[in-house]
Every structure is written in structure tokens, then in C-alpha cells.
Amino acid sequence: HSVTVYEKSSYERLGLPHKDTFDESAMEFAGLEVPESWRAPNNIITIVPLDSEVVPLTLPEDKNARSLIVERKELIRHLISLAEEAGVSFVYGEEVLAPVMLGSRVGGIVTSGGVRYCDLVIDACGVHSPLRRAMPEFTRVQNEPGEFDVLHTYRAYYEKVEGEQEPATRYNIILKNDGTVGMSWLITEEDAVDVLIARFRGTDLSGFCEPLNELYEQYGHMGKKLLRGGRITDIPVRQPLAVFVADGYAAVGDSAFMTYAVKGSGIAYSLMAGTLLANALEQDEDCLFNCDTLWEYEKAFFRQIGFDACRTALMKNLLPYLTAKEVSDLFAAKVITTEDLAELNSGSLGSLLNSQMISKVKEKLRQLKGMPELRKKLLDMVVWFGKLTIIEPFFPSKYDRDGVAKWAERYNEFFEAIKYHPAEAESE
């Protein structure tokens, strides 16, 4: 196939100025060799609750994990070089603006350089993709993310002040705000302090000043000199799109909300999804690139990745229900343990069968007899998992417009119905 990638940035400006962590298994899935310099010790994560009297929880190391840590720019350039070796062409400085619709089919793209016709458009434009946002309603491709579907994140590296005491734990996730607000992390590296502040509500840089100052005050080894980064980016933290294919169109990565919902990391899922898409296209001997062909890609994704991602998204959807104090109470009462958090971080919770998950949550409910509000919120999760069990069988094995429409309606209505709405909660 003749493949051309259109990118609005220049080659030199590609990639955010920070490091990414993902598991080596994703590279193996895609059949890619791993540069030895990317291999790194597994991160040991500590959760720091609001109440300073509650002991932070440090997760045990996931012995099955094989962590890779690489600068984003290096990762992108490595993947570009592999693509170029395979014959892919890259056009830089040309922004994708909209799809070209030829009847019911996507027949190309409109870019800042003109109209580009093609047989298949692969949408990797990101969380705010102009292609996905313009897809017609009949395709059932959801145009916009909903409330609490996106985290607005500030990430930067600050100087590390020599001589100041460093935290006992290197990688700290700080839960000092209610779930409807967001969270922060602070990672102490050899030569810098890596800071991320995430908020569900959109804001400019001024909105991150207060939480940034709180980190300065709490962690004396964090200096005020910005070394690099300092940009605001949006990360999808939700279930994958119900439908991400149409005639002549397939979405991958953040364009289809393919991230691990409790982390926001999408590199592993994107590598795997790209591989599944390539496999489906190779089976299309007539190069029709229509819904029949591309549904095989979506089906493979949901069966191998997507439904596990949905179960993880259910757990993420509980977070906005919780106040910072409730999180501290859960830690103090040992309702949430290091083992629970380790499973959530590794993704093994998401792969549990619904019946196993419900049993696990019911066990926790017995520990919450003295906390009626928390017990009710956890009970909601039991109901969610039960409802998801009913929805999954509606996923069509073959593409049929009516069947796909019914699937998308059930799927989207379910995830929208379980969202927490603060205004509604205050009026109850």
C-alpha cells in the first residue's frame, strides 16, 4: 500500500518534552524490537492521601511488568524511521482540517495544503481530532468527549535543590483534591523533579499556579526553576469509542479514546491497535476498506483490549464520586489495600471477569458498614459491572448498520448514565 502521513508540526518540533513509560509487551505485540537503552526498572508508586496522619500506600512492584522509559521525541523519531524504512511518506507542516465525504464514504482529507483524496483515512489526530468531530451522525462515531472524559494536564520538569531532603518514595501520586477536581504526581529523578497536575475542568496556566505552589511548599527539594516542559495537554481518560470505523475511515489511539483510563497512557494500546488494524487490512484482498473489512479491526480490538479497558473505565468513573477525605478514610480503614492498587495499576483488575469483579467489590462492601455514604458509592460499582455484563453481548460479530447503531446506543447510554454530576449530588 502507498501510505502518506500528514503532520501539522515540523519534524524538529514533534513530541512533547517529557518521558513516557509503557510496557515492553506492546512492542512485542507489534513485532518491534526494543532498543536496549529503553529498558528500565519498574516504577514503584506511592499514593499520598489528603490526611497527613494516614500512612501513604506504596504499591508492590509488578514482577510481570517490563517497563520501558523513553523520551517522547526519541520514541516518535524511532517509529518514524521504522515507517520510512517500510515505505511510508511523511508530509510535515500540513495540518489536517476535515474529512472529505463522498456520499456515505470518507474519501480523503482537507488539509492546510488542499484536498487529499485516498482510499482509506486512518485518524490519529488525537483527542480533539477534527476528523472524528466531523463524522456524520449515521456512522455512530461519537464526535466529542463528554464531561469527566478528558484530563487537562500540566507537566514540567523543575530543578532539584541539592541538600534538601528528598521524599522517602520516588514516585508519588497526590490525592489532595476531590475526585471532580483531579490529582497530581511528583517524581524525583536524579537530575530533576517531574511534576504533573491534572484537572477535569479546563483552565489556562494560571489555574495550575495554586497546586504548583502547594507542591513547592510540601516538597523542599523541588526548586522553582523550570528546566523543560510546562505545557498544557489534554488526555482522554474514558472507555474506547463505541464505533471508530466507517467506510474509508478508521480511528486509532487518542482519536478513538484508546487509553488506560486510570493512567491516561495510550502508547501501549495505540501500538496494539495499529497492529490489529494492519492485520485487518491485509485480509482485505480487494482493498475495499469498507465497514465490513474495518469492523474486523474493531472486533479484534474490543475482544483483545477494549472490554478490559471498559472495566478499567468503570473503576475510573468511581473516582469523581469520591471526596479527598473519603479516599483517606478508605486508606485508613484498609478497605483499599496496596494489593488492590497494584492490580489497578497493572491492568489485571480490568481483565477480571465481571462475576469476579462483583465478588471482589462485595467483599469490600462488608468492610464499610460504618460508612454508609462510601458503601452506597461502592454498591453503585457492583450495579455498573452487572449492567456491563448485559451490554457486552450486543457487540455485533459482523457489520450491520442497524446492529451497530443499537450497540452504540446501549454502550454510550450506559457510560453516560453512570457519570457523576456534582450539581445533581448537591441537590439530593
Give residue ranges: language-model regions.
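N-terminal Rossmann-like FAD-binding beta1-loop-alpha1 element of flavoenzymes
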Residues: H1-V5
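C-terminal helical "tail/cap" subdomain of flavin- and related membrane-associated enzymes
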Residues: E282-E428
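Mobile, glycine/GP-rich and aromatic-enriched active-site lid/loop segments adjacent to catalytic centers
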Residues: L57, K176-M183, I187-P240, A246-D247, ...
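FAD/FMN-dependent oxidoreductases across multiple families
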Residues: V96, T203-A300, Q304, A313
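Active-site flanking residues adjacent to catalytic metal/cofactor-binding acidic residues
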Residues: Y6, I122, G253
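Predominantly flavin-linked oxidoreductase catalytic cores and closely associated redox partners
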Residues: L82-M222, F257
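Helix-loop-beta segment of a Rossmann-like dinucleotide-binding subdomain
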Residues: E53-E71, G108, E189-R199
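N-terminal FAD cofactor-binding segment of flavoenzymes
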Residues: K8-D51
